[in-house]
Amino acid sequence: MTHDAVRLDSVTRTYGPVTALDEVSLAFPAGTFTAVMGPSGSGKSTLLQCAAGLDRPTSGSVSLAGTELAGLSERRLTLLRRERVGFVFQAFNLLPSLTAEQNVALPLRLAGRRVAKARVRQALQQVGLAERARHRPSRLSGGQQQRVALARALITRPDVLFADEPTGALDTGTGREVLGLLRGMVDREGQTVVMVTHDPVAAAYADRVVFLVDGRVHGELTGPSADTVAARMTRLEAVPC
């Protein structure tokens, strides 16, 4: 029976007079790939941050890997993120003074865990960069740097991988390679992926697409294609505020 890797129940997040999320209830089943889309300012990144424990909701509850986040101290929340969550962002956020393999090993070192070289090499092998293990970021292309960031996110074997516009800084061909890696990890490894994107082609790699408008869920698509996603987005962008 499939369980939920992440669950949000009636989550609201306000910043002063602005309501970024408004009574959002969503589940992200384990082993699935979900894309989150919506017009600019719809609450996509806020949803990801609340779901990942990077931001606390004003009201409502978030459960991550079976743990309710609301009652956790900042220290316990940080430990949970280190051990159970992976992150990939538009900016690669690699440390320039470290090699690819050292960047990948960093989450294990921060968590005080033993760094097995074979495990680091396996993570780089997964993303097709084993031969670049000793290269620093300055010697890697943008696509290669994002693949290192992906290997780093997966080194702790997280329950869920959150990706915020992971192809936003990449050219079309390189972006498709990264999306193919994400799709493959879901299919082969049962990895759970939640991805924020503005690109209908990127969203079509997912099992389903959840749409937000003005901080509220505004429907979803399963088995999406780029055309069906683009058509839905066109309609949503015409919704009056």
Identify the residue ranges that each predicted region occupies:
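The feature captures the beta-strand-to-loop junction immediately N-terminal to the Walker
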Residues: 37-39
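Conserved ABC transporter NBD signature motif
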Residues: 60-68
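Conserved catalytic motifs of ABC-family nucleotide-binding domains
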Residues: 157
